[in-house]
Amino acid sequence: MDTFQVIILALIQGLTEFLPISSSAHLILPAQLLGWEDQGLSFDVAVNTGSLFAVVIYFRNELWAMFKAWIASMVKGQHSDDSKLAWWIILATLPAVFFGFIAKDFIETHLRSAGVIAVTTIVFGLLLWWADKMSRRDLTVYQTGWRKALLIGFAQALALIPGTSRSGATMTAALMLGLSRDAAARFSFLMSVPVSLGAAILVGKDLAESPLPIDYQALTLGTVISFVAAYLCIHYFLKIISRMGMTPFVIYRLILGAVLCGFIFL
């Protein structure tokens, strides 16, 4: 890949990973518009790692408090709001892990098409709008509970379907279950840590076994750009939804889905 391609793809990954607008829908557009080939496994690992670093550093205080409380709950039997939240995040991760293992090959073979991505971008955009407008939105992140956490986890598993958007699906489910916009976003972001870490380890294992050469300069640049873009995205997204809700992202998804349909059918 040349430098321009690295910059564009890393920006797309960083900006779309945590917005409810589907990163896979955006990554398919450069290929459609510019005829770019697949960026490769090593680049995927690099930009995903950059996004992971961004959410870990942004929520470092919350994650550290949760980790300490989680350890205390196991060692000393001391339970607090932070320890409960940590357990809920772990519980919410399990459905994606389970369905990821059993459905990965089917999804890669049958669902990674532009048509599927276009449809899911539109359908789940409408579901996000409905959830944002019709739900009560008054629960904090510490009022999630294990049942709601598990249901949000199943929504995350559903997001294995390309175009759905992991953050979009989890925020939609959280809003439907009564969480506030801020709580839904924060729970979704915190959920991304174990999932992204697990995915990076699995893909990194495949990369280590690959005989293909590695362009370390491109990977470093991609990681840094993805990190900066994702960090800024998280910061400003939390500000936007507190003022405007999810409507701007719903409108964007509908337009994006229509554009993808245009590429497919015209």
From Swiss-Prot:
Its EC number is 3.6.1.27. Belongs to the UppP family. InterPro entries: UppP. The keyword Cell wall biogenesis/degradation applies. The lineage of its organism: Bacteria, Pseudomonadati, Pseudomonadota, Gammaproteobacteria, Alteromonadales. This is Undecaprenyl-diphosphatase. It is found in: Cell inner membrane. The keyword Membrane applies. The chain crosses the membrane at residues 1-21, 39-59, 87-107, 111-131, 149-169, 183-203, 218-238, 246-266. GO terms for cellular component: plasma membrane. Catalyzes the dephosphorylation of undecaprenyl diphosphate (UPP). Confers resistance to bacitracin. One of its GO terms (biological process) is cell wall organization. Pfam families: BacA (PF02673). HAMAP family: Undec_diphosphatase. Keywords: Antibiotic resistance, Cell inner membrane, Cell membrane, Cell shape, Cell wall biogenesis/degradation, Hydrolase, Membrane, Peptidoglycan synthesis, Transmembrane, Transmembrane helix. It is a multi-pass membrane protein. It catalyses: di-trans,octa-cis-undecaprenyl diphosphate + H2O = di-trans,octa-cis-undecaprenyl phosphate + phosphate + H(+). One of its GO terms (molecular function) is undecaprenyl-diphosphatase activity. Bacitracin is thought to be involved in the inhibition of peptidoglycan synthesis by sequestering undecaprenyl diphosphate, thereby reducing the pool of lipid carrier available.
